[in-house]
Design a protein with these regions (language model features):
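ATP-binding N-terminal substructure of ATP-dependent carboxylate-amine bond-forming enzymes
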Residues: 1-85, 89, 104
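Active-site nucleotide/adenylate-binding loops and adjacent lid/helix of ATP-dependent enzymes
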Residues: 76-169, 173-197
Length: 197
């Protein structure tokens, strides 16, 4: 933002947040509404750079200042089930998937989705975290042992495994005036399911 002449102010709960190296940093918890009130009074627009900002906080901020993307988009991005459901509603292809809340539902999901498959937490998983790869149906006990305890808090989803050659990312933005822009595709390199570059 700085090279574009845009002044930034950053909120993070960590005093050593990396964004604090390039912009003034407000150290506050996402539910510290007194600090967030002061933050909102100093900015024209709020955005976020990862999806684990509580959606409730984004909604709260949106009542005080413009928030982009919209808090509703953040809420969808935080839940793999909501994402996949939205994609299908938009006519996009997704791997087969099924929610899993109990060990018995994992067996049912495997019967429907098949193996290989990936059991994932619906929330807060990234870079291979919150995931277990089932190479065969016989891996169900190990998968449940690894992630089952997270089912009550985060929910789980079983997704059919998709063999792929590479993962690509694109940065796309839409301005308030409707102008839509993209930047060139970049390739993501993974090692053991974790983004390394």
């Amino acid at each position: 933002a700085a090279p574009l002449g845009v002044k930034s102010l950053v909120v993070d709960s960590a005093a050593d947040a990396c964004a604090g190296q390039v912009a003034p940093l407000v150290v506050a918890d996402w539910t510290d509404y007194a600090a967030l009130e002061k933050f909102a009074a100093q900015v024209d627009v709020v955005t976020f750079d990862f999806e684990n900002v509580p959606a409730e906080t984004a909604h709260w901020l949106a009542e005080r200042v413009a928030v982009f993307p919209a808090p509703q988009a953040l809420a969808v991005a935080q839940d793999r089930l909501a994402e996949k459901t939205l994609f299908r509603e938009c006519g996009l292809s997704t791997p087969d998937f099924m929610t899993v809340d109990t060990r018995e539902q994992l067996d049912q999901a495997l019967a429907r989705v098949g193996a290989p498959a990936i059991l994932k937490t619906r929330r807060l998983g990234y870079d291979g975290k919150g995931q277990f790869r089932l190479r065969a149906v016989a891996d169900a006990d190990a998968a449940w042992a690894a992630l089952g305890a997270q089912a009550p808090a985060h929910g789980l989803i079983l997704e059919a495994f998709v063999p792929f050659e590479r993962e690509l990312s694109v940065l796309a933005v839409r301005g308030r005036d409707g102008d839509f822009r993209t930047w060139p595709l970049t390739r993501n390199w993974h090692v053991d399911g974790v983004l390394s570059m």
